[in-house]
C-alpha cells in the first residue's frame, strides 16, 4: 500500500491518498482544496476508484463532490447516523465563516459493523466509532497494519465531543472497545496531526490512562 498524507485547508486535515501497485487509488476524507488533490492524483497517474469518508464534518468532506464530479467516482461512508451532518453542510460552512458548501449525501453508507470493504489491493474492516460524531467510522487494514480513524484517536489526544451530538463517554468507549484491542503495531492515520500506533497510545495517551 502506498500512502500519501496531504494536509488540506486551514484545519490541516489529513487527506489520505492511497494506491496499490497497479495505481488503483482511493482518497480518504478529502476535506478541501479539490484542485490541489486533482493535480496530485493526475501527477501520480492514478486511477481513482472511490472516495471514502469517516464522518460528516465539513473539514473531512469539503472536496468530495468536486472530486466525484471530476473523476466520475462514488462517495462511500460514513455510517448513516451522520446523515444530519451532510444535510447541514451549508450551516457548518457558515459557522466557520467559509464559502458555501452544498449539502450532499454519500452514494453508500457503512451501517454494518465489521463489514469488509474489498477494494483493489485493500481489505478494510469497517468499525463504527461513535463519539466525535454519532456515525463516525474507521477503515482498518489489518494485513497492512494501518488504520484510518478520522477524528477519534490522535497522538496524545482524542477527538472533540463539543460538536452537535458528540459524546465524551461514547468516544472513550469506542476507543477502548474498538481500537485498543487492535494489534499494538497498527499505525493510526488520524484526521489531524502526526501518525501514531495503537501501542504508543495505550502507553502514553493521557485521556486513556486517566483514572477518572
UniProtKB/Swiss-Prot annotation:
Cofactor or coenzyme needed: Zn(2+)
Lineage top rank: taxon: Bacteria
GO aspect biological process, one term: response to toxic substance
Residues passing through the membrane, by range: none
InterPro entries documented for this protein: MBL_Glyoxalase_II, Metallo-B-lactamas, RibonucZ/Hydroxyglut_hydro
UniProt-annotated binding residues for Zn(2+) 2: 59-60, 151, 192
Residues the record lists as binding Zn(2+) 1: 55, 57, 132, 151
EC identifiers of the protein: 3.1.2.6
Annotated pathway: Secondary metabolite metabolism; methylglyoxal degradation; (R)-lactate from methylglyoxal: step 2/2
SUPFAM superfamilies attached to this UniProt entry: Metallo-hydrolase/oxidoreductase (SSF56281)
Enzyme class label: hydrolase
Keyword Ribonucleoprotein: no
One MF term in the entry's GO annotations: metal ion binding
Keywords for this protein: Detoxification, Hydrolase, Metal-binding, Zinc
Cofactor binding note from Swiss-Prot or TrEMBL: Binds 2 Zn(2+) ions per subunit.
Catalytic activity: an S-(2-hydroxyacyl)glutathione + H2O = a 2-hydroxy carboxylate + glutathione + H(+); (R)-S-lactoylglutathione + H2O = (R)-lactate + glutathione + H(+)
Task performed by this protein: Type II glyoxalase, isozyme of GloB, that hydrolyzes (R)-S-lactoylglutathione to (R)-lactate and glutathione. Plays a role in methylglyoxal (MG) detoxification.
Similarity field: Belongs to the metallo-beta-lactamase superfamily. Glyoxalase II family.
Protein name, as recorded: Hydroxyacylglutathione hydrolase GloC
Amino acid at each position: 500500500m502506498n500512502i500519501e498524507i496531504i494536509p488540506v485547508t486551514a484545519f490541516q486535515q489529513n487527506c489520505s491518498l492511497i494506491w496499490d501497485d497497479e495505481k488503483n487509488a482511493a482518497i480518504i476524507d478529502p476535506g478541501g482544496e479539490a484542485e490541489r488533490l486533482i493535480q496530485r492524483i493526475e501527477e501520480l497517474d492514478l486511477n481513482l476508484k472511490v472516495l471514502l469518508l469517516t464522518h460528516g464534518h465539513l473539514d473531512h468532506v469539503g472536496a468530495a463532490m468536486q472530486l466525484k464530479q471530476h473523476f466520475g467516482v462514488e462517495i462511500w461512508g460514513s455510517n448513516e447516523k451522520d446523515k444530519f451532518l451532510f444535510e447541514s453542510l451549508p450551516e457548518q460552512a457558515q459557522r466557520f465563516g467559509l464559502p458555501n458548501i452544498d449539502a450532499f449525501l454519500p452514494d453508500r453508507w457503512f451501517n454494518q459493523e465489521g463489514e469488509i470493504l474489498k477494494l483493489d489491493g485493500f481489505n478494510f474492516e469497517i468499525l463504527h466509532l461513535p463519539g466525535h460524531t454519532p456515525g463516525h467510522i474507521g477503515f482498518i487494514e489489518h494485513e497492512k497494519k494501518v488504520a484510518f480513524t478520522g477524528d477519534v484517536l490522535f497522538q496524545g489526544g482524542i477527538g472533540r465531543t463539543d460538536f452537535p451530538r458528540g459524546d465524551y463517554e461514547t468516544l472513550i468507549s469506542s476507543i477502548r472497545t474498538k481500537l485498543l484491542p487492535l494489534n499494538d503495531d497498527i499505525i493510526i492515520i488520524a484526521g489531524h496531526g502526526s501518525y501514531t500506533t495503537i501501542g504508543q497510545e495505550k502507553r502514553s495517551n493521557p485521556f486513556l490512562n486517566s483514572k477518572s
